């Protein structure tokens, strides 16, 4: 089973989280001239809203180039898309009470207010309403994936400083863990640490695009220099991955996206052996599960030096930006 929603036009990058042909439109994104670009629009398969309805869930997606947080919600058999503008949103973390969004220079926190939800239109059909509560200034740390752990502690992938960090009321961020090959904290994106997988409320797996201690050193071998690591040991579970992202532990298995190949893979954490189980026409970033279903974010990938020389850009295929659901 594969179902899809495509975010068309100016949408080039996605991150996501979960907790008939349809079409929706919104205004042009923040920081982009609305007079020069068409509106952001989406097209989906008939089964997509039906799946969300069966799950009794909505899907939250960020697209950093379009500057949007997008909520995909089932409504009367159709898909309702709700857009909100943010400054280059990427990382998302959520539970029943809190929604946090990592953007350019800060992390914004929203609190679920059930009393407000009861008063929102359509009356009786809105079961959650996340209201803005505070914003934490991090500076330019290139926030990638985030996750809530034990005691609602927010863990953040600090890509610029090559570490995992948390937040407090005094500092921009508090470094908590870094790969063993990183010798110090400096804002030069040495290994492009990006993905974070939690187990039992604690960080357990991370991905990086290179095993390097040099400033932006990961770029030299981005095609197949990616690694999947254990936390806190720092042991490298597997190497030679093509731009890996979004490690997840689900149903007793370790999953990871090889973005450079557009794949969803299963990894044996003991041997490091990995097997692709699904291939998609896009740069895979952002992964969440609901039962047997995997929700996967896809980006089109811009033709720049950063993305040149990787398998998916060398293939003569039409790349999509959106969300795929794989059973």
Where on the chain are the PLM-derived regions?
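Loop/turn-rich, solvent-exposed surfaces of beta-rich toroidal or solenoidal domains
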Residues: 243, 248-269, 273-316
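Blade-loop segments of beta-propeller domains
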Residues: 78-145
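Beta-propeller blade signature
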Residues: 222-232, 312-327
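Beta-rich, blade/repeat-based domains predominating
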Residues: 42-55, 85-97, 136-153, 182-204, ...
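Asp-box/WD-like beta-propeller blade repeats and closely related beta-sheet repeat scaffolds
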Residues: 120-194
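Short, conserved, GDST-rich strand-edge loop motifs in beta-rich repeat architectures
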Residues: 44-56, 109-120, 206-223, 298-318
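Conserved beta-strand positions in repeat-built beta-propeller and related beta-rich domains
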Residues: 61-64, 100-106, 148-149, 154-161, ...
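Short loop/turn segments that connect beta-strands within beta-propeller blades
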Residues: 74-75, 113, 168-171, 231-233, ...
């Amino acid at each position: 089973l594969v179902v899809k929603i495509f975010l068309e036009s100016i949408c080039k990058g996605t991150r996501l989280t979960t907790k008939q042909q349809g079409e929706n439109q919104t205004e042009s994104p923040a920081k982009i001239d609305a007079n020069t670009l068409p509106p952001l629009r989406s097209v989906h398969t008939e089964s997509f809203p039906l799946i969300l309805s069966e799950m009794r869930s909505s899907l939250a997606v960020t697209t950093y180039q379009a500057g949007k947080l997008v909520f995909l919600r089932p409504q009367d058999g159709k898909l309702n898309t709700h857009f909100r503008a943010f400054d280059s949103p990427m990382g998302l973390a959520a539970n029943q009470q809190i929604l946090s969004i990592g953007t350019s220079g800060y992390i914004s926190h929203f609190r679920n207010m059930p009393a407000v939800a009861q008063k929102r239109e359509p009356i009786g059909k809105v079961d959650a309403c996340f209201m803005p509560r505070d914003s934490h200034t991090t500076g330019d740390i290139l926030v990638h994936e985030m996750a809530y752990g034990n005691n609602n502690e927010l863990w953040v992938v600090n890509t610029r400083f090559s570490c995992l960090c948390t937040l407090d009321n005094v500092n921009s961020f508090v470094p908590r863990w870094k790969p063993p090959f990183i010798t110090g904290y400096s804002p030069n994106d040495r290994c492009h640490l990006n993905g974070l997988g939690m187990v039992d409320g604690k960080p357990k797996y991370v991905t990086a695009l290179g095993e390097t201690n040099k400033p932006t050193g990961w770029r030299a071998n981005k095609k197949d220099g990616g690694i999947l690591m254990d936390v806190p040991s720092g042991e490298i579970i597997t190497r030679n991955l093509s731009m890996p992202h979004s490690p997840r532990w689900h149903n007793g298995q370790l999953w990871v996206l090889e973005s450079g190949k557009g794949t969803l893979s299963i990894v044996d954490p003991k041997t490091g052996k990995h097997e692709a189980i699904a291939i998609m026409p896009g740069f895979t970033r952002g992964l969440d599960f609901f039962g047997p279903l995997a929700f996967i974010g896809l980006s089109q990938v811009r033709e720049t030096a950063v993305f040149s020389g990787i398998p998916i850009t060398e293939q003569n295929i039409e790349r999509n930006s959106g969300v795929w659901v794989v059973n």
